Each structure stands twice: as C-alpha cells, then as structure tokens.
A protein has these predicted regions:
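Charge-rich, low-complexity N-terminal segments
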Residues: 1-31, 35, 39-59
Length: 59
C-alpha cells in the first residue's frame, strides 16, 4: 500500500469516508458519526481497506 487517498461526504448526521489504495485502486467505504475526529474516521476506513486487501490476497 503505497499511498491512500481519503474522501469525505457528509450525509446528514453521518459522514461517508472512502479510503482508496492508489496502487490497486481498491476502495473501502465506512459510514461514521459526524462528531468523530478526522483521525478516527481515517483509522476506521484504513482498517477496512487493510481487511479488504488481505481478503483479496487469499482469493
């Protein structure tokens, strides 16, 4: 995972956070409460991205 881009879209009381691995073009999307810190939002999205990349390796 060379570089990860984050995109934030507010939807009412929630924020949709997308983490994109630029190397594999894999995307992970999480929906979190709007009150969460940016760091926590990124952490949750990154955890899901890592999970998806590991899952992809085993397939």
């Amino acid at each position: 995972m060379a570089e990860v881009l984050f995109e934030y879209v507010r939807q009412g009381a929630c924020v949709k956070v997308t983490a994109i691995d630029t190397e594999t073009q894999t995307e992970a999307v999480v929906v979190v409460p709007v009150g969460l810190s940016e760091k926590d939002m990124q952490t949750k999205a990154l955890q899901k991205l890592v999970y998806l990349l590991k899952k992809k390796e085993t397939e």
